[in-house]
Amino acid sequence: MEELQGYLEKDRSRQQHFLYPLLFQEYIYALAHNHGLNGSIFYEPVEVFGYDNKSSLVLVKRLIIRIYQQNFWISLVNDSNQNRFVGYNHNNFFXSHFYSQMISESFAIIVEIPFSLRLVSYFEEKEIPKYHNLRSIHSIFPFLEDKLSHLNYVSDILIPHPIHMEILVQILQCWIQDVPFLHLLRFFLHEYHNLNSLLITQKKSIYVFSKENKRLFRFLYNSYVFEWEFLLVFIRKQSSYLRLTSSGTFLERTHFYEKIEHLQIEHFVVVCRNYFHRTLWFCKDPFMHYVRYQGKAILASKGTHLLMKKCKYHFFNFWQYYFHVWSQPYRIHLNQLSNYSFYFLGYLSSLLLNFSAVRNQMLENSFLIDTITKKFDTIVPVIFLIGSLAKAKFCTVSGHPISKPIWTDLSDSDILDRFGRICRNLSHYHSGSSKKQGLYRIKYILRLSCARTLARKHKSTVRTFLRRLGSGLLEEFFTEEEQVLSLIFPKATPFILHGSHRERIWYLDIICINDLVNHS
């Protein structure tokens, strides 16, 4: 436990005292958008009620100046109380909702500044080139291809929820020693909860956030997940023979945050002393790997089934004792990798076993040696994608293409552009699939849906419309993967295109998941 205590207290200088003076200064506008922050991977444009970036940021700057004005807070609280107990007032409700959104944007911008600058300085110190490529969702799949083929068991974890708002504030208290900010954040969360807009409830996952306030709540969610992932980092460091100095994690914004090596958790030591000091031995597995995505996580290991069951048991106790969250057993599924397929970031992933026989000749005797090789395989989940297309009104639940009536008011070029963009994005994202036949079916549905939409607009049949304009009209807007490959590898096209339906390609420019892919 002395080692754990030192691990927690080694770097207390990382605690932040930044917010108290900044809230009283107008220059936060310039500080939040200096060259270092705009160039970092933390930066995202602020989008507020459809305003452009310049207008919305001006509103953020003005709101920061008004945050501590007494009349503003009294008006905001009175408006929210009137809406709850007196009746619905559209103007007051809109004003309260608008200011709540602006406050959350202000919080998010301010609180990201030190973490962003620290991350940029870290990459400059380590001289890591092209770290923007680490943002790509596809960058995690080569890691899985390299590691999972050597492992035996995988635990599919659904991160527990809900998490109480007060616990979220306490988590930030470990990082930020600014009392006014914590009180202000607590007040805002409670008022926002009273307006029934905060989506941290028992019926909805903490991963699903309000569209209007997603920036702040993503930060709070990442703080919550970072807290319980810290235990994995500590145990991994204790069990690893190499004693790794750092580890990385993909957060929900698909940005690559470098895991902070030291995290100050005051009462975490008490929990570990009372419970985990007898059980740290169970994770002494040098082949344990952890990946988190979309409110879920995968914990894979080369250990035995008994070891993984112990990990599952201690996860439940950790969530219960530390976060006061009751987690049901169904939230962790333990399976053997060779007999299990799991949905992961838009792909149906599994571990394939290839059996082969090798004839060995020794003097006059010959015998066969059976060998087994493992391969990490990713395919397109056709059924799920068809369900997403049906939900978006591109086809029926059985996969029969239908027209998109809501788009018939657009011009022909806009209709073709929309369908073509969706088709190209899906092809680009699922380029890592080992079997492209399912992707061809999705393309066929989109093409025929596009043709039906155009025919409906011109009050004609699909056959008549295509006969008049030619079937090549659609080909221009649906770039095939082979054409993309020929542009990337012009000199090696014949070799690459041979069997291209089986080739897997991972791109380093995919930083978000298409809504049609993100159906989980």
UniProtKB/Swiss-Prot annotation:
PANTHER family: MATURASE K. Belongs to the intron maturase 2 family. MatK subfamily. It holds the Pfam family Intron_maturas2. The lineage of its organism: Eukaryota, Viridiplantae, Streptophyta, Embryophyta, Tracheophyta. It is found in: Plastid, Chloroplast. GO terms for biological process: mRNA processing; RNA splicing; tRNA processing. The keyword rRNA processing does not apply. Keywords: Chloroplast, mRNA processing, Plastid, RNA-binding, tRNA processing. One of its GO terms (cellular component) is chloroplast. Usually encoded in the trnK tRNA gene intron. Probably assists in splicing its own and other chloroplast group II introns. InterPro entries: Domain_X, Maturase_MatK, Maturase_MatK_N. One of its GO terms (molecular function) is RNA binding. This is Maturase K.
